[in-house]
Swiss-Prot record:
Protein name (Swiss-Prot/TrEMBL): Periplasmic nitrate reductase, electron transfer subunit
Disulfide bonds: none
Keyword list, A-Z: Electron transport, Heme, Iron, Metal-binding, Periplasm, Pyrrolidone carboxylic acid, Signal, Transport
Signal peptide: 1-29
InterPro entries found in the cross-reference section: Multihaem_cyt_sf, NapB
Entry GO MF terms: metal ion binding
GO annotation terms (biological process): anaerobic respiration
UniProt-annotated location(s): Periplasm
Length: 161
């Protein structure tokens, strides 16, 4: 008979026991977790310290072309670019650096590689992947390095050691 089945009574009792165990366990003081969260590190290995961000360095605007530190290094921008518009529709750098404008502006011409797509096909205009100049070229600023520069290019210069 159905009224005689003892397993019907065990299920509610087991559930009540589990609930009591969970409540008592939650009320007990918890031990310190074994894993502790550490502060984030910045790229120099220092702990994350929130505070005032230092201003950018003063731009060098002498229009002197700088020597590159290694082959294939993109040249730095030796003039101010404050207010230059660089959008999908407008690139003010092209006003001076496109081949047809360099004679009048005296600016160096864009490398021919900027007119080649990824397959090596020469285009009539700057390839879209080279259109945003500041992705590779940066404005030179007068700042002290954050860390000492120990870069050695391994390239043997003619007449050098």
């Amino acid at each position: 008979m159905r009224g005689q089945d003892p397993s019907r009574l065990i299920r509610p009792a087991a559930m009540a026991g589990l609930l009591l165990f969970a409540l008592v366990g939650a009320a007990l003081p918890q031990a310190e977790p074994a894993v502790q969260i550490v502060p984030a590190l910045d790229r120099l290995g220092r702990a994350d310290v929130r505070g005032q961000i230092p201003p950018l360095g003063r731009p060098i605007t002498d229009d002197v072309r700088r020597m590159r530190n290694y082959p294939e290094q993109p040249p730095v921008i030796p003039h101010s670019i404050d207010g230059y518009q660089l959008t999908v529709n407008t690139n003010r750098c092209m006003d001076c650096h496109k081949p047809q404008f360099t004679e009048g502006s005296g600016a160096p011409m864009i490398s021919v590689t900027h007119f080649q797509d990824r397959d090596g096909q020469v285009l009539t205009d700057v390839t879209p992947r080279r259109y945003f100049c500041t992705a590779c070229h940066v404005q030179q600023t007068d700042v002290q390095p954050l860390v000492p520069n120990q870069f050695r290019d391994g390239y043997r210069h003619a007449g050098g050691p």
